[in-house]
Amino acid sequence: MVRESIPKEGENIKIQSYKHDGKIHRVWSETTILKGTDHVVIGGNDHTLVTESDGRTWITREPAIVYFHSEYWFNVICMFREDGIYYYCNLSSPFVCDEEALKYIDYDLDIKVYPNGKYHLLDEDEYEQHMNQMNYPHDIDIILRRNVDILQQWIEQKKGPFAPDFIKVWNERYKKIRQY
């Protein structure tokens, strides 16, 4: 049995995304922990190797801050690009950590947020298809739809990872940790 463990500041961990059927979806090879508690994990990565379920690999193009919360069914990736900060929000199970990686189940729905604050809900067709193929329980559908609403409120209210201070503080912390 693998024990649960909270990653420590400065530690490098893997992030593993699964699908509802238990199959691996995507793996980020290295993320540096900036904050790790029972409820929140914040990390940073840059030019990180990502492996897809079919074995294909690619490398992230820009620095990013990642945000995971144990009570919400989403995670947020804040990407620093030349024309501004973009957010990619995955509707997912709350995270768990063990000695191997930080892990979550990806539930297909995503929200992309642009530097001007506009956002779009993505992959609704994929969600419907996988909900039928993998028999997502009705309760999960209700939880995910409720969390889409929560996430949209956070975006509009600039709350949590969407707050300008959040980005500034955690990006600076990531830069400092990378220097050592």
Curated annotation (Swiss-Prot):
Q: Where is the active site?
A: R26 (proton donor)
What PANTHER family does UniProt report for this protein, alphabetically? Answer: PTHR39159, UPF0374 PROTEIN YGAC (PTHR39159:SF1)
Reactions catalysed according to its record: a ribonucleoside 5'-triphosphate + H2O = a ribonucleoside 5'-diphosphate + phosphate + H(+); a ribonucleoside 5'-diphosphate + H2O = a ribonucleoside 5'-phosphate + phosphate + H(+)
Give the top-level enzyme category.
Answer: hydrolase
Q: Which residues form a coiled coil?
A: none
- GO molecular function terms attached to this record: magnesium ion binding; nucleoside diphosphate phosphatase activity; ribonucleoside triphosphate phosphatase activity
Q: Where does Mg(2+) 1 bind?
A: N90, D106, D110
Keywords in UniProt for this one?
Answer: Hydrolase, Magnesium, Metal-binding
Q: Where does Mg(2+) 2 bind?
A: D108, D110, D123, E126
Report the protein name in the record: Nucleoside triphosphate/diphosphate phosphatase
Q: What family name appears in the similarity comment? A: Belongs to the Ntdp family.
Q: What does this protein do?
A: Has nucleoside phosphatase activity towards nucleoside triphosphates and nucleoside diphosphates.
Which cofactor is recorded for it? Mg(2+)
The EC number(s) given in the record are 3.6.1.15, 3.6.1.6
Question: Which Pfam family would be a valid example here?
Answer: DUF402
